[in-house]
From Swiss-Prot:
It is an enzyme of class 6 (ligase). This is UDP-N-acetylmuramate--L-alanine ligase. Pfam families: Mur_ligase, Mur_ligase_C, Mur_ligase_M. Belongs to the MurCDEF family. Pathway: Cell wall biogenesis; peptidoglycan biosynthesis. InterPro entries: Mur-like_cat_sf, Mur_ligase_C, Mur_ligase_C_dom_sf, Mur_ligase_cen, Mur_ligase_N, MurCDEF_pg_biosynth, UDP-N-AcMur_Ala_ligase_MurC. ATP binds at residues 126-132. GO terms for cellular component: cytoplasm. The gene is murC. Its EC number is 6.3.2.8. The lineage of its organism: Bacteria, Pseudomonadati, Pseudomonadota, Gammaproteobacteria, Enterobacterales.
Length: 491
């Protein structure tokens, strides 16, 4: 970015000129890193801290950010403001030091709100589908030549980044309800994909509180703004009369303003027709599998249509959509001869879904696109509280696969809860008599345990939000082949 462009950006909010150095605590998270990346490209001095390097910190370092792989008071020295992830506790030494030095400490959504303040903001909220829908909206606007800024919670594979600074008035951002901080945002357009009971600790276990928070988020829209909402979702249908803003509904339902018809999945692609009020029908080829992704695309089309984007640009963007990292992410197809001596191959797919609804959607997409495959899932439950609260739902969903390997619960900082662990969940599933799950206590043994399960016509789903994505990449690197001790030492 040249000096003239930077001066123009800085002039949007003159008071932000007082801010020179922005420090992020927990900078390696995708949501934090995306905002840091946009601000780095706007010319701000960026620093941050996290526990270990990852692709996000590597990208930020390449942009000139200073990253500390520790949490120490001196890391916030000279910072104008400290941005904190919701995963960071109040007693973090950097947070304590910032308060003592009277440095403002804000949550990531508050900084995102500043980026959005004088732009045309499009915020994507909902329990499931936010990241993919954000990527789809961004792809359509980019294809139409509108050069948007976007900040996403996952890797936008076509761009190779989580966030990008554009030079137009549009800012497209994932809005996170997990800590209710999306209430800081004041967009012009808001998508709500669905609403389910998740992150209930934030909402004191009260689902009505969660629903009202979504209403409050939508009422942050100006009176001339627009809420785009999935009418297939029963909670959204219930809340629609309480939304005091202009609305566009979408879904498979007959009464949707933008309606999906004739959905068919062939391999990794969805094919369907979109019916829009007062507009020509669109015959869509979507390069992403599953009815849930057809809904995500329909939300993106509804927003783009309202903006007057050309239909050809919409169709091109969806047909060439490259997806987002860890969302039905195809990692390869590998011959089994070196793995277990069998002929045939196994496909490897990595997916972030960690709620029963998301896992169910991934399984359905796999079954629809590859109905003859032996469906093998490696599942890592995420958080003891989620496993406890949705225990029966997990047990019901996970019995739909042909073979199940389960890792221990990824705690995400939580302490174990009796009966909400992987061993208990495996026992419950086994007692239902459909499949016999295998508990994998040592992730280093996963390839050895997986090999005899594979038949020669397999689709392996690596599923979860913890560190299971690293296991998926490892399995891809070794091409599923169990490693000898010597191979591991030279790997």
């Amino acid at each position: 970015m040249n000096t003239q462009q930077l001066a123009k950006l800085r002039s949007i909010v003159p008071e932000m000129r007082r801010v020179r150095h922005i420090h992020f605590v927990g900078i390696g998270g995708a949501g934090m890193g995306g905002i840091a990346e946009v601000l780095a490209n706007e010319g701000y001095q960026i620093s941050g801290s996290d526990l270990a390097p990852n692709p996000v910190t590597q990208q930020l370092t390449s942009l000139g950010a200073t990253i500390f792989f520790n949490h120490r008071p001196e890391n916030v020295r000279d910072a104008s403001v400290v941005v904190v992830s919701s995963a960071i506790s109040a007693d973090n030494p950097e947070i304590v030091a910032a308060h003592e030095a009277r440095i403002p400490v804000i949550r990531r959504a508050e900084m995102l709100a500043e980026l959005m303040r004088f732009r045309h903001g499009i915020a994507i909220a909902g329990t499931h589908g936010k990241t993919t829908t954000t990527a789809m909206v961004s792809s359509i606007y980019a294809e139409a030549g509108l050069d948007p800024t976007f900040v996403n919670g996952g890797l936008v594979k076509a761009a190779g980044v989580h966030a990008r600074l554009g030079h137009s008035r549009y800012l497209i951002a994932e809005a996170d309800e997990s800590d209710a901080s999306f209430l800081h945002l004041q967009p012009m357009v808001a998508i709500v994909t669905n609403i389910e009971a998740d992150h209930m600790d934030t909402y004191h276990g009260d689902f009505e509180n969660l629903k009202q928070t979504f209403i409050n988020f939508l009422h942050n829209l100006p009176f001339y703004g627009r809420a785009v909402m999935c009418v297939d979702d029963p909670v959204i249908r219930e809340l629609l009369p309480r939304v005091g803003r202009q609305t566009t509904t979408y879904g498979f339902s007959d009464d949707a303003d933008v309606r999906v018809e004739d959905y068919q999945q062939i391999g990794p692609q969805g094919h369907f027709t979109l019916l829009r009020q007062g507009m020509p029908d669109l015959r869509v080829t979507l390069n992403a599998p599953g009815r849930h992704n057809a809904l995500n695309a329909t939300a993106a089309v509804a927003v783009a249509t309202e903006e007057g984007i050309d239909d050809d640009a919409i169709l091109r963007a969806l047909e060439s959509f490259q997806g987002t990292g860890r969302r039905f992410d195809f990692l390869g197809e590998f011959p089994l001869e070196p793995v277990n001596g069998k002929s045939g191959t196994a496909m490897l797919v990595d997916d972030y879904g960690h709620h029963p609804t998301e896992v169910d959607a991934t399984i359905k997409a796999a079954r629809a696109g590859w109905p003859d495959k032996n469906l093998v899932m490696l599942f890592q439950p995420h958080r003891y509280t989620r496993t406890r609260d949705l225990y029966d739902d997990f047990a019901n969903v996970l019995t739909q696969v042909d073979a199940l390997l389960m890792l221990d619960v990824y705690p995400a900082g939580e302490t174990p809860i009796p009966g909400a662990d992987s061993r208990s969940l495996c026992r419950t599933i086994r007692n239902r008599g459909k499949i016999d799950p295998i508990l994998v206590s040592d992730p280093a043994q996963i390839a050895t345990i997986l090999a005899p399960v594979l038949t020669g016509n397999d689709l392996i789903l690596v599923q979860g939000a913890g560190n299971v994505g690293k296991i998926a990449r490892y399995l891809s690197e070794i091409k599923l082949k169990p490693q000898t001790q010597e191979e591991e030492q030279h790997g």
